[in-house]
């Protein structure tokens, strides 16, 4: 199976650094780790997918785990938008699709007995816009055009991609339910330090500064946010990488309509342009007459949208989609937007650490370990966050074993 250039570079960096596991090892990592020393206290920074899976597996291994999360919810960039929509409709702010070859994502979906459903509809036609032309195509033609445009295998056959019934954030909430009070929400980190005996984190909770100590720390905070934390416990090389890692913009605009007027024209609400924008209809298999069309703008177009005020984003998108689908303006009820550069606890959608820096970026420093989609070959996917979290579980368990022998 073909891989992306980005995945090739990341995999090469992992091999050179000898600081990670290959994908087949990651798939079995949880089954091969055995607690071989007394349980240690592990402090995990961030309750996104990497932090959650690490906390879940370390807890099963018998370690004493605490998670600090700045937000008031789990999931990080896996979040389902339900407000301000009517009739229980929803759409995704972040991760939405599960390619068929993302084995770790499927593993935990199955473990938590979460139902899946197709991401793309098999009926009606999608739209393809290319060099000024407009063409109606069946969904397989739509996904073929998308794959051709990006120039690489997107992860199996897109028409076989799935989504989690009820919303993507059902998965992080399943992790969080099992971790319970181990997660401390509303607790942003302000300082990370360590010495030969322990690691320490200073954080805020209810406006008051507090300190926690641990045998090991797993930091899953995006580098775009971590660069604003006092990193006294890290090397100058690591701090330089954190400071210079680039995060891309992604912007999404959602339009709720009274009726799914596009279906009257034989369209399923999905469209692909030759530029940096996809159009999805996440409500195609949600009940009721109302629907949501959403634009998914990637770097380039996303920065332009982010600079607009929210009402301008909605108005501009309504005009664009109205021209594409027709009849949309009369059916429009309300809109919403999500621009990840503006998100206080993400400051971007996904990261590019860079080939020359990747080995140093993923390497632990003393008692402090690192994980997240930004430190994975599967950048921007739930699969990436999960795989990096499991890598960190392996690292921490090995660290504990070594320490026990000293």
What is each stretch, according to the model?
Residues 219-236:
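Flavin (primarily FAD) binding-site architecture
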Residues 155-208, 215:
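Helical element adjacent to the flavin cofactor pocket in flavoenzyme catalytic cores
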Residues 1-16:
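N-terminal secretory signal peptides and thylakoid transit peptides that target proteins
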Residues 76-160:
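Active-site-adjacent segment of FAD-dependent monooxygenases/related oxidoreductases
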Residues 11, 20, 53, 61, ...:
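Conserved flavin/dinucleotide-binding core of flavoenzymes
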Residues 45, 212-224:
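Short hydrophobic core segments
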Residues 59-81:
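Glycine-rich FAD pyrophosphate-binding loop
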Residues 41-67:
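N-terminal Rossmann-like FAD-binding beta1-loop-alpha1 element of flavoenzymes
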């Amino acid at each position: 199976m073909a891989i992306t250039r980005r995945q090739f570079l990341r995999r090469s960096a992992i091999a050179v650094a000898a600081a990670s596991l290959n994908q087949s090892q990651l798939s079995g990592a949880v089954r091969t780790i055995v607690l071989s020393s007394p349980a240690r206290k592990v402090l995990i920074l961030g309750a996104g997918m990497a932090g959650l899976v690490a906390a879940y597996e370390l807890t099963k291994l018998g370690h004493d785990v605490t998670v600090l999360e700045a937000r008031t919810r789990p999931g990080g960039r896996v979040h389902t938008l339900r407000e301000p929509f009517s009739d229980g409709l929803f759409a995704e702010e972040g991760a939405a699709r599960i390619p068929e070859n993302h084995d770790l994502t499927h593993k935990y979906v199955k473990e938590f007995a979460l139902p899946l459903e197709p991401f793309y509809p098999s009926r009606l036609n999608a739209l393809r816009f290319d060099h000024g032309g407009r063409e109606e195509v069946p969904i397989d033609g739509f996904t073929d055009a998308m794959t051709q445009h990006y120039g690489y295998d997107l992860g199996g056959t897109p028409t076989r991609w799935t989504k989690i019934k009820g919303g993507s954030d059902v998965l992080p909430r399943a992790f969080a339910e099992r971790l319970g009070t181990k997660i401390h929400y509303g607790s942003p980190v302000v300082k990370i330090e360590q010495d030969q005996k322990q690691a320490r984190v200073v954080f805020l909770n209810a406006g008051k500064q507090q300190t926690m100590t641990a045998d090991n720390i797993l930091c899953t905070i995006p580098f775009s946010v971590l660069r604003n934390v006092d990193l006294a416990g890290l090397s100058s090389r690591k701090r330089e990488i954190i400071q210079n890692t680039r995060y891309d913009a992604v912007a999404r605009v959602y339009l709720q309509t009274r009726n799914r007027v596009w279906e009257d024209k034989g369209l399923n609400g999905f469209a692909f342009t030759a530029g940096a924008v996809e159009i999805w209809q996440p409500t195609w298999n949600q009940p009721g007459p109302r629907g949501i069309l959403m634009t998914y703008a990637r770097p380039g177009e996303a920065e332009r949208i982010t600079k607009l005020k929210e009402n301008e984003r909605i108005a501009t998108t309504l005009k664009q989609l109205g021209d594409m689908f027709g009849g949309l303006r009369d059916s429009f009820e309300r809109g919403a937007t999500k621009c990840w550069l503006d998100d206080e606890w993400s400051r971007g959608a996904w990261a590019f650490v860079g080939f020359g820096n990747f080995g140093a970026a993923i390497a632990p420093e003393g008692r402090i370990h690192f994980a997240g989609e930004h430190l994975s070959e599967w950048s921007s996917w739930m699969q990436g966050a999960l795989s990096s979290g499991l890598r960190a579980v392996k690292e921490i368990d090995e660290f504990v074993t070594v320490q026990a022998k000293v």
